[in-house]
A protein has these predicted regions:
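Two-component/phosphorelay signaling modules centered on CheY-like receiver
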Residues: 11-29
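Acidic, metal-coordinating helix/loop segments flanking the phosphotransfer/catalytic sites
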Residues: 30-48
Length: 120
């Protein structure tokens, strides 16, 4: 079973993604902010991380920087999911090492397809 870590502080998004990915046979882990995600990543090794940019404590950009510094986590596929839709934000996210940058609002169905494409 593939593992996915969803990192977002919006409960409705988390609930929708958790439900959908579980339905698609993923083991799902949830973090509400970057620090919680980094704590989970100490004990779990997901195949994919869906990462919001704007979060309390540690934002998504800083979280990805920490992930990429960790040899154990470098292989994880990362998708930014954010309302920040300016070119500079997208470029920054991809430059930090994200595989995709998806802008909110988004299609959950398409996101699942993108995740599946990344891990094949």
């Amino acid at each position: 079973m593939k593992k996915i870590l969803i990192v977002d502080d919006e409960p409705n998004i988390v609930m929708a993604l958790e439900y959908t990915f579980k339905k698609n046979n993923f083991e799902v882990f949830i973090a509400r902010d970057g620090q919680e995600a980094l704590d989970i990543l100490k004990v779990q090794l997901p195949d994919v991380i869906i990462l919001d940019v704007m979060m309390p404590m540690v934002d998504g950009f800083a979280t990805l920087e920490q992930i990429k510094k960790d040899e154990r986590l470098r292989h994880c596929k990362v998708i930014f999911l954010s309302a920040k839709n300016k070119e500079k934000h997208i470029e920054k996210g991809l430059a930090l090492g994200a595989n995709l940058y998806v802008v909110k609002p988004f299609s959950v169905k398409k996101l699942v397809e993108q995740v599946q494409d990344l891990i094949q």
